[in-house]
């Protein structure tokens, strides 16, 4: 596995958060629990303090390497949900991987100028952000294998549609950025997950050929803070 030359990695964002700085802090106490079973996409049974609870999982991915019986997770108390707890992170490769996708746009906004728009209607989709002449879509990534970060970990028709919409915007003269937030710090480079969603992979590479900027950032959980670690490049392939 080789990394792509970072000089060819376009898509730098206007506001550069320094490496090692916090981009989010949980105000709730984080508790260790263990997975009993995943009930459905958004519900997981866990054991905490010797009792079983249902916890909300705000991540629709398969997460087979993270949410499985016996694995260690971090939970926090949440209000406004039918469950008392939400899963915040899961243990993998000697680190906790943040799973709550509600945080993605909050984190992404730290790297943008103050004047931006959110949830802009474009065609049949909504693009996460717009600033100046640039549209930016955010994707969260939790799957890492052999130091390569992969997205998606489940087929995503929505993700493919977003790429098509970004290409249409580029044809109209706008800039477009795909911002990928890798919610762990053990990846050295990124690739679209061709095995899981070959259609997304095709759309990804076609979009880059047509001028899509890609920016990939890694993070780690330290105590109750999410820390920005560094940017990583696309992995070197015959398509880069």
Swiss-Prot record:
Which GO-annotated molecular functions does the record name? DNA binding
Name the residues that span the membrane. Answer: none
Gene3D superfamilies named among the record's database cross-references: 2.40.50.580, 3.40.1350.60
Known InterPro entries for this protein? SfsA, SfsA_C, SfsA_N
Q: Which family does it belong to?
A: Belongs to the SfsA family.
**Name of the protein this chain belongs to:** Sugar fermentation stimulation protein homolog
Give the source species.
Saccharolobus islandicus (strain M.16.27) (Sulfolobus islandicus)
């Amino acid at each position: 596995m080789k990394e792509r030359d970072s000089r060819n990695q376009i898509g730098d964002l206007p506001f550069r958060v320094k490496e090692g700085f916090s981009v989010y802090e949980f105000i709730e106490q984080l508790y260790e629990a263990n997975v009993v079973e995943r009930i459905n996409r958004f519900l997981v049974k866990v054991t905490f303090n010797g009792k079983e609870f249902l916890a909300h999982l705000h991540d629709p991915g398969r997460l087979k390497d993270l949410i499985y019986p016996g694995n260690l997770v971090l939970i926090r108390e949440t209000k406004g949900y039918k469950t008392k707890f939400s899963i915040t992170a899961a243990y993998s490769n000697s680190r906790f991987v943040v799973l709550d996708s509600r945080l993605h746009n909050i984190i992404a906004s730290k790297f943008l100028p103050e004047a931006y728009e959110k949830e802009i209607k474009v065609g049949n989709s909504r693009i996460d952000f717009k600033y100046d002449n640039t549209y930016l879509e955010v994707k969260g990534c939790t799957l890492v294998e052999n130091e390569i970060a992969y997205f998606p970990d489940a087929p995503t028709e929505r993700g493919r549609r977003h790429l098509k919409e970004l290409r249409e915007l580029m044809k109209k003269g706008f800039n477009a950025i795909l911002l990928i937030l890798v919610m762990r710090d053990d990846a050295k480079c990124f690739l679209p997950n061709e095995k899981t969603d070959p259609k997304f992979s095709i759309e990804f590479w076609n979009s880059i050929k047509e001028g899509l900027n890609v920016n990939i950032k890694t993070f780690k959980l330290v105590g109750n803070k999410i820390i920005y670690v560094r940017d990583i490049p696309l992995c070197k392939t015959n398509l880069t």
